[in-house]
Amino acid sequence: MTTAEYLAERRRIIDRVLEENLPAAETQPTSIHEAMRYAVLGGGKRIRPILAIAAAEACGADYEPLLRYFAALELIHTYSLVHDDLPALDNDDYRRGRKTTHVVFGEALAILTGDALLTEAFSWLSRPTGDPGRQLRAIVEVATAIDSTGMIGGQVADLEGSGAAGFSPPAGGLKAAAPLERLEFVHRNKTGKLLTASVILGGLLGNATDAQLDALRRFGRAIGLAFQIVDDLLDQEQTSEQLGKTAGKDAAQGKLTYPGLIGTAAARTRVDELLAEASENAAIIGGPVNYLAPIGRYVCERRS
């Protein structure tokens, strides 16, 4: 199976799980459930749950009983997008090639939609599974990845760096750090930690050894940073139609980017270095079916 075929098949599987397990649009109150389904089911690469599947497969596990846990990662990712698109944050009108949730349903319902998706995700993650100890470790891993020292912290640091209206960061700390240090902090936290938690979730529920978990963590850290550097490059190179979201917004908002700080060529070199690091660790994990390195290449070579 080629990488493209693997990704397409796993994406269809995740889409089915999401479709079947999200509350039906007819469930009262219908407005919130319509908005949740609109936000989640409107496309997307499903990279986070696919990485979890790939990690579990590499560890020799049957991923089918674990799909709902892995699909929860997409709920978390979508919650972050719904909130990130709000006027108070990135103020974006388009996501995944169509109008953002707050444009269609209003800001108040969009906020509640994000809240509901995050809550639903942890409901899915906490359903009983084979090994309660490993499941608890997995839940803590995901929760820590998105807390104020993870994804939320990265979002705050991103706001601090953008000079957002009404947002006055304290002196010192990240504000005093070198620009590249601040940017790496944003990327590793806002995007990278949930990607890392995705492969760790797959490993923990897939009965990975400690050595495999260590390699998965190194793989995730490398791919997480590479993913966001590629996003920086695409933001300046692709059109809004190609990206499915507004292009060029980071530069327009005065945000730090890798090509803006070190140039396009050096940014691409850094992506290549991170891909090599990820591939090296994917090989350490081994396994009968291991698509981690090919997925890493896809992440680094994607055009949207």
Question: Can you describe what each PLM-predicted range is?
Answer:
Residues 13, 22-281, 287-300:
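Mg2+-dependent prenyl diphosphate-binding active-site environment of isoprenoid biosynthetic enzymes
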Residues 1-23:
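N-terminal amphipathic/basic leader segments beginning at the initiator methionine
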